[in-house]
Amino acid sequence: YGAMFILLPLSDAGIPETKEEKHKIIETIREEAIRLGMTKEDIVVDGLVATVGANPKAAIECLDTISYCREQGLATICGLSNISFGLPERSCINTAFLTAAITRGLTMAISNPAQEALVDAAYGADLLMNKEGADLRYIQRMNRKSAVEEKSFLRGGEKDRESSPKEKVFDCVITGSKGSIVEE
């Protein structure tokens, strides 16, 4: 996104207790950055995600900050897994929070790309929010997933037959097995 820095809405007093305090800190730092010659496009605001296990209002407060930043034309980022810290089945909470954050204007997230449901939810939320190019990205992702699943299904019924070298290379490309592709 070309950001020059990530704005952490913290003060000498620490983490702000209210969203209003957080928004005031964002505005103060943004004004200083602009005074120093930066543009709002140079700034990415961290939503400062807290765990809902300790603060039941943490998600709403972060989502409100993301909305505030969108209204100000500022990009946003947040560490998704912070929201679910200390809770069971964290991936469910992380996925739900990500989709809510995208609808509020989240620009980017620090997340685990190996969590398929989380990544799929991001593609789906972008599509539903009518983000430019999201329709094609969603279709391409789902087509890739379908191709892998179909190939896996077809392979399951062909255990008695040896795969051709071409089929083995295809499987390696689809599954991302870089080391195996050289062997095949």
Feature map (PLM): residue ranges:
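ATP-dependent carboxylate/acyl-activation modules
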Residues: Y1-D42, A50-I77, S81-E184
